[in-house]
UniProtKB/Swiss-Prot annotation:
UniProt keywords, alphabetically: Actin-binding, Cell projection, Cytoplasm, Developmental protein, Neurogenesis, Phosphoprotein, Repeat
Matches recorded under InterPro entries: RPEL_repeat
Residues found modified as Phosphoserine: 125, 127, 140, 156, 282, 303, 353, 436, 452, 462, 473, 524, 526, 567, 600, 638
Bias (Low complexity): 198-230, 245-267, 345-357
Compositional bias of kind Pro residues: 358-371
Biological processes, Gene Ontology terms: actin cytoskeleton organization; closure of optic fissure; enteric nervous system development; negative regulation of integrin-mediated signaling pathway; neural crest cell migration; neural tube closure; positive regulation of catalytic activity; regulation of cell cycle
Lineage, opening ranks: Eukaryota, Metazoa, Chordata, Craniata, Vertebrata
The gene coding this protein: PHACTR4
UniProt-listed Pfam families: RPEL (PF02755)
Name of this chain's protein: Phosphatase and actin regulator 4
Subunit structure: Binds PPP1CA and actin.
Biased composition, class Polar residues, residue ranges: 114-124, 233-243
UniProt repeat feature RPEL, residue ranges: 72-97, 593-618, 631-656
Location relative to the cell: Cytoplasm; Cell projection, Lamellipodium
Amino acid sequence: MGQADISRPVNPDGVEEIGQPTADLGMVMDCVEAGDITPPTKRKSKFSGFGKIFKPWKWRKKKSDKFKETSEVLERKISMRKPREELVKRGLLLEDSEQGGEDPGKLSHATLKNGHTTLIGSTRSSSPVQVEEESERIASLRKPVPEEEPKKRLGSSGSQPHSEAEFVPESIPKQPLLPPKRHLSSSHEANEGQAKDATSSGSLARPSSSASTTAITTAPAATMAATNPAKTVHSSGPPSQAPRTLPAAPASTHTTATLSLTHTGPAKQPPIPPPKPTHRNSNPVIAELSQAINSGTLLSKPSPPLPPKRGIPSALVPTSESAAATTATKAPSDQREKSACSVGSEPLLTPSSSPLPAHIPPEPPQSPPFPAKTFQVVPEIEFPPSLDLPQEIPQQESQKREVPKRMLDHSFGEPQVPPRLPPVPLHIRIQQALTSPLPVTPPLEGSHRAHSLLFENSDNFSEDSSTLGRTRSLPITIEMLKVPDDEEEEEQSHIFAFDEDVASTSVIPKLPQCLQEEEEGKESDSDSEGPIQYRDEEDEDESHHSALANKVKRKDTLAMKLNHKPSEPEMNMNSWPRKSKEEWNEIRHQIGNTLIRRLSQRPTPEELEQRNILQPKNEADRQAEKREIKRRLTRKLSQRPTVAELLARKILRFNEYVEVTDAHDYDRRADKPWTKLTPADKAAIRKELNEFKSSEMEVHEDSKHFTRYHRP
């Protein structure tokens, strides 16, 4: 991520100015674009590398003794560096004229280191200790590495998960490619030394001397020296092409690196941590392209693809040519045996795009020999940390040869299938995946190849199921999680898990008619003949299966149940339990009584009409009723007596009607003045009223003596 900030342009004289600041971004990008390569997809920012060197949030946690220890290691290493002339004499460096005469396109091409891009000649400040005595390097490696190194390494590699597929996680992405003369352990130790140097030289700002230009020239020398043997080796591997083609230089650099890593097996090796799964980042398009070329039969290995991501140029996916070259150099006789095993096609296990095949992680020694094709699913806990690579690689190849032979020979008497079959629809492939533990997948064309990545007919699932100690239902490997409890079970159960699958009796489900006709043309070349029995062990292990496998299993179980569904006459016969005629009559009588009782509680239509719930029959009847009511009313009104008749009958006693005058209405309740009167006001009103009565009201003579006011 931050190589562009630490790197410097190649100095053709080999003379390094000590006080020179770091090269700006433009010069580095111009060097990258000098050849006829596709430019990188995403340019790095100018300050992206500062986080690697200056981490003030980490400085709190560091202690001064770690700084002292690192500076002592640095001083000791810098004091023991060889001058440039001695390195040229020993043949580790080229002369300036030879270096200048090389192809500028090859020099300027960005090489792949630990999943990052760096220029071959631009990693100068990070490698002051690259060429030194191997004994001193071993001695410095045995010293305890300070704790700041893993933190820095986490900071650099944790941001790019696709770099984990390169199997050297100790190396920080700043070191150049190692010369091919070196042993494997020494290259690892040099990587660790460089990691120390790079981290502390950024923080301590140590001036470099002229011998640090050795790193610049060793990498092109290694590149050009190993191009010819790599090209001769290429012819033995099967020709294939990667998703994007590369110039010859990066391919040959990969080949030299892997050649040097493969052939030399020293006594001591640092432990190689297993690769983290690249499965979740895998680009299905690249996987399809590489699978179309490399896998001719059902036993050839699908490629673990490295998708171009973030700052990596897309041209950095390494060619399968170089990978094939490494496998060819590893064991040509192995290639012949493997090609004899496979059904008339390319060699069995040709990794199409894994960049360093020498770093295949070792299997646990107690596991039975199954082909170690996919290491994506196997979790980290499985690998013992102290196994040596050179002993493990032949063992693995013998395992890879054993099982496909065993599978092909003992396929339980089934006829061998020719490799080319017509493409099969997805639902039939799901059916086949469910009816056989190792499913049939004919060679795929077109859009079916994407589905084949899910329903893959690989042997890897036999390895996964054996090492993880569980039986197989579907080979859809969607990265199962490893629970710590599984480790205890796995030693007992993985020994007989494979035999149990082979020997299990099975029932062939009845397929629909359309599927049966297609099934007759195809015979399964796997080692079982029927569906998986849903046993009790699988019920216990249901949590381990992926969601997709469970979904497909549910759907297929439902389809099988629907296939076995009885016909309608059978259902009609068996739906009711048989009863005698008397029982049937009794049941009918009870039902009839209940219905009659409920019907009798309903209101009659007359009641409903009276309640105006039920309307009369029709509109004509309704109109007739209205006319009748009107006629009756008019007759009554016409028969009323007049006022004269009423006066004559002395019913009306007045000769005139009461006259009515208009008056404004007012609210009597609101107008209550007497409520607001004081007692004095009330007494005054009463006195006034009494005076009016005594003076103006007339009283009958006979009753005058009853009044107070009218005394005689």
